[in-house]
C-alpha cells in the first residue's frame, strides 16, 4: 500500500505484470474510488461549464460523456476529466483525485446564478472493470464508448460508464459507497483479476494516456501536450485565446512517445538531449522494452527521430514513435 492523493492505495495484488496482462487479454478490476465526483446542476449549469471546459458540451446528449480539460488563463491544464451529461441542466464530472479540491473551488468561485456545484465524492465508489472480456464477464449488454446507463449487477444498481484508462474495452461502475465492497466481491466472483496502481500506470502509458502531474499540468498547455483535439477553439472558454495563439503559431515543444533502443528504463525527470525531459516512463510488459513520454523541441518531435536519454548517468538511445505505443492486434 502507498499513499496517493490522501488515500492508501494498493500498488499490486499478484504483481504488476500478471495484472497488466490480465487486462490486455481477459479482465481486470481496479478500485478507483479515490477519483473525485462533482455534480453541476441548474438552469445555467450548461452555460457555466461551456465557459470553463475546453471541449464542446453541445456535442453530447443526456446519456453520453466527453473527455475534456479544465484550463487556466494561460491554457494550462488544471485537470483532465470526463463530463457526463445526466440530463439537461445536470452534469457529473469525474476528476483526478489529487485535483478534486482544486477543481471544486475553481468551479465554485465561478458559479453563476442558477447553477450549483456540489462535491459528492464521499457518496460514491467507482470500480473500473477493463479488458477484452470485461463486458462478457459482467453479463452486461455492450454499448458505444463514452455512453452510460443504469443497470443492475447481482442485485446492485450501478451507473455503467463505457469509459476507462487502459486502452481496452471496459466499463467503470459507479455505485453508492455503501455498496462498494459487495460489488467488488461480485466482480471478483465473475473472474476479474484485482489490479493495483502499478498496472494502471503501465497500461495507460502503453496507450499514451497522459497522467496529470507528470505529462500535463497547470504549466503545460493543451496544444503542446497533443490535446488540441479536445479543445473547441471555435468557442470561448477560459484560456481559449492563448490556446488559439499557440495553435496558430505552433508550439515550441511537444509531448512525444518513445521506445528505448538500448537497455534502460526511462523515468520521470530524466533529461533528453537537446533540452527535453521524460515525463513518464516504464518497462512495457507487452513489448518487453522501456517506453515513455516526454517533451522535446517541436523540430525534434517527428516519429522516427532518435533521442538520447540520460538514464542514471548513462546515455541511452530511444526512438520517437506514433501514439499509441502499443496497439492490440486485430
Residue ranges and their predicted role:
Residues 46-50, 67, 80, 90, ...:
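Generic internal hydrophobic packing segments that stabilize the cores of diverse globular domains
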Residues 32-43, 84-92, 205:
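N-terminal glycine-rich flavin-associated loop
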Residues 1-71, 76, 198:
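Acidic, proline/glycine-enriched N-terminal capping motif
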Residues 78-81, 320:
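Short beta-strand and beta-hairpin "edge-sheet" elements
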Residues 1-11, 17, 86-330:
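Conserved, structured C-terminal
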Residues 31, 80, 172:
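Acidic active-site catalytic centers that drive phospho-/nucleotidyl reactions
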Amino acid at each position: 500500500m502507498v499513499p496517493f492523493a490522501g488515500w492508501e492505495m494498493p500498488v499490486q495484488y499478484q504483481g504488476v505484470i500478471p495484472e497488466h496482462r490480465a487486462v490486455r487479454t481477459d479482465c481486470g478490476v481496479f478500485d478507483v474510488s479515490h477519483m473525485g465526483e462533482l455534480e453541476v446542476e441548474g438552469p445555467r449549469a450548461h452555460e457555466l461549464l461551456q465557459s470553463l471546459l475546453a471541449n464542446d458540451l453541445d456535442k453530447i446528449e443526456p446519456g453520453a460523456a466527453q473527455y475534456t480539460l479544465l484550463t487556466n488563463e494561460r491554457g494550462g491544464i488544471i485537470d483532465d476529466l470526463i463530463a457526463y451529461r445526466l440530463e439537461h441542466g445536470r452534469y457529473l464530472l469525474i476528476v483526478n483525485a489529487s485535483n478534486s479540491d482544486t477543481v471544486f473551488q475553481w468551479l465554485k468561485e465561478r458559479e453563476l446564478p442558477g447553477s450549483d456545484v456540489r462535491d459528492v465524492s464521499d457518496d460514491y465508489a467507482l470500480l473500473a472493470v477493463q479488458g477484452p472480456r470485461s463486458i462478457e464477464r459482467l453479463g452486461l449488454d455492450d454499448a458505444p464508448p463514452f455512453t452510460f446507463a443504469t443497470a443492475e449487477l447481482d442485485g446492485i444498481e450501478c451507473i455503467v460508464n463505457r469509459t476507462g484508462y487502459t486502452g481496452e474495452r471496459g466499463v467503470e461502475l459507479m455505485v453508492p459507497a455503501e455498496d462498494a465492497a459487495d460489488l467488488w466481491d461480485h466482480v471478483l466472483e465473475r473472474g476479474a483479476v484485482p489490479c493495483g496502481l502499478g498496472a494502471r500506470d503501465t497500461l495507460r502509458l502503453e496507450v499514451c494516456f497522459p497522467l496529470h502531474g507528470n505529462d500535463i499540468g497547470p504549466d503545460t498547455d493543451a496544444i503542446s501536450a497533443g490535446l488540441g483535439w479536445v479543445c473547441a477553439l471555435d468557442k470561448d472558454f477560459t484560456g481559449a485565446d492563448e490556446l488559439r495563439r499557440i495553435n496558430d503559431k505552433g508550439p515550441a515543444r511537444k509531448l512525444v512517445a518513445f521506445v528505448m533502443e538500448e537497455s534502460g528504463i526511462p523515468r520521470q525527470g530524466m533529461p533528453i538531449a537537446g533540452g527535453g525531459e521524460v515525463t513518464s516512463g516504464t518497462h512495457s510488459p507487452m513489448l518487453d522494452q522501456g517506453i515513455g513520454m516526454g517533451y522535446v523541441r517541436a523540430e525534434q518531435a517527428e516519429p522516427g527521430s532518435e533521442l538520447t536519454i540520460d538514464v542514471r548517468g548513462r546515455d541511452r538511445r530511444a526512438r520517437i514513435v506514433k501514439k499509441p505505443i502499443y496497439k492490440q492486434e486485430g
